[in-house]
């Protein structure tokens, strides 16, 4: 009976509140909330505001990302590996007694002064770069100072090792890694990464990663984005010494995907050695059984002749897939007289239409077609604020999920979170863009609820998605490698 009276009382009180709403619609909201609370019927429901574009986009990705029907079981990765010593670039250069002068790029670093100038040049642009340091003794002194510097951190480094580490996070995958692997690197590697005994060596190869924050200043230079400058005196990786070990390991390992990187490390070698080694790379790739796709991960380069040789000396036709960023894409086009090659550098965010034109040209000129015996059918392009996956129709499946997964991992890895933290990322991709500048491209308006945009051009399909950029990145090194690995993990190669 008491229960019935309580329910009736609540009903009458609710009716009374309804009458107040009806008769006094102008009554302030605070007064109504106070009245509601005083009736002890619980707090008034707080209206839920609209979700942020970042929250909508992250939720849409999660709904889109699905496993491929046929998944990789065994992945072989080679051939560059090292220990990354990560440190504040400005603090290290100050500790070395250097002061900020004028920024200037150097294709090869010969001195501390060259290092200071090149670091400032790229810091001022907020762009990533990698250079070879020619003087062994000077590099050793700098590396020792960096390694012992307070706050210096040691990580797995080298594109192949970083890609292998990312794949190894999937425990149902078996991962083979070949490269010059010393004791420190071996200690840092995931237990799921198998290293052939022939890859082990007594000393590690060290790469110095000079990081800077967005807005960080040194002298007259201010970084527009957080990024890093990488340099090394790396002879094992530079000569691709582990290439033969890598190829000889494949027969026993029996991979269903091969990932190759490290060609950029040859920039410190003579032209004769570069030419000889590239031919050996092509021969090695040709020995991999038909039906096993090979992905080539490119990295920062300055030698146009080397890049042109990679494009033209049968390396591109021998691989099925490419991974590269905006600097490598434009440099590739400049080296091989491709579209928009008169552009000296990107002005801010790379134009989507221009990027699309260059990707189209690579696949049309060097990819598979009825008239060309090439294996190249896929390119995964990544820049800070968006990614594009371009594929020749009929050869790859699940690319919508693959491009979304690659973009998602960019946000989680940079912020060092398991999932996207929408409070720590921002949507910076262009809200509108044209898909081509060389023909009448479509006009696209970005919709966070449908974050993957697809368009087609003469038998080539493009998948575009924005990136949720980490506002306060914990670590920028290896993002491109993680992006490419994640995109490959979700990709499915269709059998010929």
Curated annotation (Swiss-Prot):
Q: What residue stretch is flagged as signal peptide?
A: 1-22
> Coiled coil: which residue ranges?
none
Indicate whether Cell wall biogenesis/degradation appears among the record's keywords: no
Q: Domain ADPK: where? A: 52-496
What binding details are noted for the cofactor?
Binds 1 Mg(2+) ion per subunit.
Q: Which cofactors, if any, are listed as required? A: Mg(2+)
**CDD domains recorded for this chain?**
ADPGK_ADPPFK (cd01938)
**Which Gene3D superfamilies does the protein's record reference?**
3.40.1190.20
Subunit structure, as described in the record: Monomer.
Q: Give the protein's biological function.
A: Catalyzes the phosphorylation of D-glucose to D-glucose 6-phosphate using ADP as the phosphate donor. GDP and CDP can replace ADP, but with reduced efficiency.
Of which family is this protein a member? Belongs to the ADP-dependent glucokinase family.
Q: What is this protein called?
A: ADP-dependent glucokinase
Native source organism of the sequence: Mus musculus (Mouse)
